[in-house]
């Protein structure tokens, strides 16, 4: 990967498949966000950190054949997957470029909308990305974010293994400059980037048995297992014990799993 690739969850094939699945899981929420913004036919939109699919299809349908969408993604593999997805769907008004979210190289003040979904929660120095997004939109254009705040992501009955793994994960993220609670800050970040008329919409869910996102915490800690162990934040034996306990707990239909608090926020460039 590029030397400046700092994406928290990495770019493994497993992570790319998770992101492809996530695109479908979050499509309805993203569609409502774009509906509230009022993205018109003929608009020009850019998605930062689009991954292998992101919101590209949703944006394509809204801007229509007279509009255009650019997806920016750092991972070469994800760029390839996104281009294959667009080709399979015969989507002609979207292009995907390999690039850094904080320095896209795209023309300034060109777009009607710049958007990112669950990118800032996985990247150090997220303010640089918001500033870049603000620079890309024209006067009157909109920057829209959809981010997570981990504070609400809990289970009931409580489970010591959940708490132990979460401490290890949060500690590791802090060491890498990642803010897992960034959702609560994004409205302020938009204002600090010079945007006005900032709007905020919260989202939270219960992940019932058989819900595809019920094991999301388990997926994250397994993804980061080797790196967490390498930092000495938990022993290999304790990690394995906690994973087994968590798997059993999630398998019980009476276990309540509450999602992250998701925050959608958007603002207009004066």
Residue ranges and their predicted role:
Residues 112-127:
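A short SAM/SAH-binding and catalytic strip from SAM-dependent methyltransferases
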Residues 24-44, 58:
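Conserved alpha-helix/loop element of class I SAM-dependent methyltransferases that forms part
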Residues 8, 14-15, 199-257:
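C-terminal helical/coil "lid" or tail adjacent to the Rossmann-like core of SAM-dependent
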Residues 144-211:
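Conserved catalytic/acceptor-binding region of the Class I
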Residues 4-26:
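Class I SAM-dependent methyltransferase Rossmann-like catalytic core
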């Amino acid at each position: 990967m590029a030397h400046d690739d700092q994406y928290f969850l990495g770019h493994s094939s497993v992570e790319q498949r998770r992101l492809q699945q996530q695109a479908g899981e979050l499509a309805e929420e993203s569609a409502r966000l774009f509906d509230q913004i009022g993205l018109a036919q003929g608009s020009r939109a850019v998605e930062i950190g689009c991954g292998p699919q992101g919101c590209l299809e949703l944006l394509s349908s809204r801007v229509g054949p007279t509009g255009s969408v650019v997806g920016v993604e750092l991972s070469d593999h994800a760029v390839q997957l996104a281009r294959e997805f667009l080709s399979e769907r015969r989507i002609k008004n979207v292009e995907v470029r390999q690039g850094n979210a904080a320095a896209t190289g795209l023309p300034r003040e060109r777009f009607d909308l710049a958007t990112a979904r669950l990118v800032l929660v996985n990247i150090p120095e997220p303010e640089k990305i918001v500033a870049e997004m603000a620079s890309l939109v024209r006067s009157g254009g909109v920057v829209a974010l959809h981010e997570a705040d981990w504070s609400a992501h809990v289970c009931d009955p409580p489970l010591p293994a959940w708490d132990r793994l979460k401490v290890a994960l949060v500690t590791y993220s802090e060491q890498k400059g990642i803010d897992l609670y960034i959702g609560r800050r994004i409205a302020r970040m938009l204002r600090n980037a010079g945007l006005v008329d900032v709007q905020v919409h919260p989202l939270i869910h219960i992940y019932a048995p058989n819900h595809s996102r019920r094991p999301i915490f388990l997926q994250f800690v397994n993804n980061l297992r080797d790196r967490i162990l390498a930092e000495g934040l938990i022993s290999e034996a304790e990690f394995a014990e906690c994973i087994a306990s968590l798997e059993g707990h999630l398998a019980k239909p009476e276990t309540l799993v509450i999602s992250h608090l998701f925050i959608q926020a958007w603002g207009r460039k004066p």
